[in-house]
Curated annotation (Swiss-Prot):
Keywords: Developmental protein, Differentiation, Disease variant, Glycoprotein, Growth factor, Mitogen, Proto-oncogene, Secreted, Signal. GO terms for cellular component: cytoplasm; extracellular region; extracellular space. One of its GO terms (biological process) is positive regulation of MAPK cascade. This is Fibroblast growth factor 3. Its main location: secreted. Pfam families: FGF. It is found in: Secreted. GO terms for molecular function: fibroblast growth factor receptor binding; growth factor activity. It comes from Homo sapiens (Human). The gene is FGF3. Belongs to the heparin-binding growth factors family. Residues 225-239 have a biased composition (Polar residues). Residues 1-17 form the signal peptide. SMART domains: FGF (SM00442).
Length: 239
């Protein structure tokens, strides 16, 4: 009889909270297939380091590729727009990472549905970013209701630093795995100098063949040009 009472008391003790209809399963970065639970707020400044050893970068021209070197265009702002859905913006290019209906990555000047990606956490701390809008749906009869019949299109950078088309990607491929890296001291110095509006450092640069004119606020270089020039100078000083 005493054993029965002990069992009943153990059932009444507080344990794991019951999952109600609106409860979400929270997982940390080590959780398999987990999602980040933050909503909105300040963007995370990160560099997305692909398992192929390239940093994802967004150019002012709209081009997307990978860089092996320290580049201002690889400094990104990752903002959660919904639970598990993020927008990725280049800090100095001012453009959003986007994927079109053909699976091509590009840097969009304006935010749209093509700029939203599903962020998932995988083992070893790597993340994947899949287009929220586009995916491959099987045409097999009856497969429409099966989640396994859909194949997501992932952000991917191959071993040559070139973006892969979404429909050719897989979640388990190295080219689809990204490690969010915190900015180092060189990145912070680059951000500080560019945001403080310091004059560009002296050195050789591509100059138009015309008469020298006094530099006015209207003739100042755009921030993305300063970013490129400053990145080159920091690389040279590091060596």
């Amino acid at each position: 009889m005493g054993l029965i009472w002990l069992l009943l008391l153990s059932l009444l003790e507080p344990g794991w909270p019951a999952a109600g209809p609106g409860a979400r399963l929270r997982r940390d970065a080590g959780g398999r297939g987990g999602v980040y639970e933050h909503l909105g707020g300040a963007p995370r400044r990160r560099k997305l380091y692909c398992a192929t050893k390239y940093h994802l970068q967004l150019h002012p021209s709209g081009r997307v590729n990978g860089s092996l070197e320290n580049s201002a265009y690889s400094i990104l702002e990752i903002t959660a727009v919904e639970v598990g859905i993020v927008a990725i913006r280049g800090l100095f290019s001012g453009r959003y990472l986007a994927m079109n209906k053909r699976g091509r990555l590009y840097a969009s000047e304006h935010y749209s549905a093509e700029c939203e990606f599903v962020e998932r956490i995988h083992e070893l701390g790597y993340n994947t970013y899949a287009s929220r809008l586009y995916r491959t749906v099987s045409s097999t009869p009856g497969a429409r209701r099966q989640p396994s019949a859909e194949r997501l299109w992932y952000v991917s950078v191959n071993g040559k630093g070139r973006p892969r088309r979404g429909f050719k990607t897989r979640r388990t491929q190295k080219s689809s795995l990204f490690l969010p890296r915190v900015l180092d001291h060189r990145d912070h110095e680059m951000v500080r100098q560019l945001q403080s509006g310091l004059p560009r450092p002296p050195g050789k640069g591509v100059q138009p063949r015309r008469r020298r004119q006094k530099q006015s606020p209207d003739n100042l270089e755009p921030s993305h040009v300063q970013a490129s020039r400053l990145g080159s100078q920091l690389e040279a000083s590091a060596h």
